[in-house]
Amino acid sequence: MATLRVSSLLASSPSSLHCNPSVFTKCQSSPRWAFSFSVTPLCSRRSKRIVHCIAGDTLGLTRPNESDAPKISIGAKDTDVVQWQGDLLAIGATENDLARDDNSKFKNPLLQRLDSKLNGLLSAASSEEDFSGKSGQSINLRLPGGRITLVGLGSSASSPTSYHSLGEAAAAAAKSAQARNIAVSLASTDGLSAESKINSASAIATGVMLGIFEDNRFRSESKTPALESLDILGLGTGPEIESKIKYAEHVCAGVILGRELVNAPANIVTPGALAEEAKKIASTYSDVITVNILDAEQCKELKMGAYLGVAAAATENPPYFIHLCFKTNSRERKTKIALVGKGLTFDSGGYNLKTGAGSKIELMKNDMGGAAAVLGAAKALGEIKPRGVEVHFIVAACENMISGAGMRPGDIVTASNGKTIEVNNTDAEGRLTLADALIYACNQGVEKIIDLATLTGAIVTALGPSVAGAFTPSDGLAREVVVAAEASGEKLWRMPMEESYWESMKSGVADMINTGPRDGGAITGALFLKQFVDEKVQWLHLDIAGPVWSDEKKNATGYGVSTLVEWVLRNSL
């Protein structure tokens, strides 16, 4: 690979769970229970090593390759852009940075000096390509000694999303050129405070790390990106910026885990596989994280009838209830919180089977996107180790399948707080599993809860594929999460909790039904979950059905990990 020298460019099946369909429903006139459980041990052949290195047979004999997360040396440097040496230089420029003088020369000092070294090639190329610095624009210059990429940042680069996009564009150019050493710089840092520069460097690093990552575990042949080092130029140096970049690396590792969990098919990531991944996280960070995995029999003892009702039909892959706890040795504790993730490793819809092209049943492996975000956050926090906060990570993992033992439309299940639910739609199963998970979280004595779930298609209709819906009765918690999401560059929008809609969720024979009319479906879904949260606990529900998956890239996004980690840190000492 040639080295870019800006100053001289022109010179050179096992046992399983069986239970009767109406799990944990007790008729008032008949106190009899009828259960028959036979539970696969957690370390059975089907769930021995999870996601990163599966051992044992799976349906289709698929065995993924090792995870190939990027290993990049990242540093903040004060090297002059014009003097930097490497394979590819990416420069982020706003529309103002591209302004020209009367002689069609750049007014921006950095672009002016760079263009002078290149004998006007930069200005000529930007004119020829009609590059004006608009968001989404980019041009690539192939030069004898390497490449230069100009990336548009729009009218102003004032958000982490802009710098994240710059990093992603740099990563795309690096992959195309198979570059080993790249640098990223801003054309201008005018108006950026010292803190903003640090945050910008972190966002750029995040964009490069996530942009360079490719999930090739299920490809018979793949090309590993060549990128080895990233220099971030002109945004400062020193311990603070290096610490922020290291933080970004830890968060990206969590995001990549989240992506891999969602990308992996349901014949690889089963409920047992998620449980094993949780055990792996606890083992890796045993100084701060403990794990407790409950099997079906233990969940039965806790009267988790809503969760077990959903899981009843999955005779090949029994449910596992996952509870990780993060706690440092510090005696000081600011707050105690819980992160709850929906963990449906596959959702067929049950007897209300998903049918037709619009059902996207082939993508129902992503119905555990909430669980993936929670486990990704656990991994990141295990590395970061914030002080003074206790975090409970909770996932009720199971499959929603069809069998003679399965839950039927019209069945009534009883949650662990005693509330009864008439199941009028077996495809509204996630909220049933979350009901028992939220009750369990409240029983841990937490003060705040965030749950994440691919809960409704209605939220995608309302907000589109890129924005999550946030539901909470707490204005204070809403502000906390919105600020954390903005700092992380993830998009969410607070939605109303219209209490009058609850009337449509009332049952004639039980306390409630599990799904209401089509209109306002995302709201009634959130109102349903609210029935299982203690009134004294602050709670926020994130419906991530849209941003969990990118149709354009045909890949998981890892949505939620960054926001969760940022929110936890803001609740720490």
From Swiss-Prot:
Segments passing through the bilayer: none
Binding site for Mn(2+) 1: 342, 347, 367, 429
Summary of the tissues where the protein is detected: In tubers and floral buds of untreated plants. After abscisic acid (ABA) treatment or mechanical wounding is mostly accumulated in leaves, to a lesser extent in stems, but not in roots.
Binding residues annotated for Mn(2+) 2, in chain numbering: 347, 427, 429
Obligatory cofactor(s): Mn(2+)
Transit peptide: 1-53
Gene3D superfamilies per record: Leucine Aminopeptidase, subunit E, domain 1, Zn peptidases
Single GO cellular component term: cytoplasm
Places the protein is found: Plastid, Chloroplast
Active site: 354, 431
S-S pairs: none
EC number(s) reported in the record: 3.4.11.1, 3.4.11.5
Cofactor, how bound (note): Binds 2 Mn(2+) ions per subunit.
Pfam family, one: Peptidase_M17
Catalytic activity: Release of an N-terminal amino acid, Xaa-|-Yaa-, in which Xaa is preferably Leu, but may be other amino acids including Pro although not Arg or Lys, and Yaa may be Pro. Amino acid amides and methyl esters are also readily hydrolyzed, but rates on arylamides are exceedingly low; Release of N-terminal proline from a peptide
Top-level taxon: Eukaryota
Biological process (GO), any one: proteolysis
Gene Ontology molecular functions: manganese ion binding; metalloaminopeptidase activity; peptidase activity
Induction: By abscisic acid (ABA), jasmonic acid (JA) and wounding.
Function: Presumably involved in the processing and regular turnover of intracellular proteins.
HAMAP family, alphabetized: Cytosol_peptidase_M17 (MF_00181)
UniProt family annotation: Belongs to the peptidase M17 family.
Subunit field text: Homohexamer (dimer of homotrimers).
This protein's name: Leucine aminopeptidase, chloroplastic
Organism: Solanum tuberosum (Potato)
Underlying gene: LAP
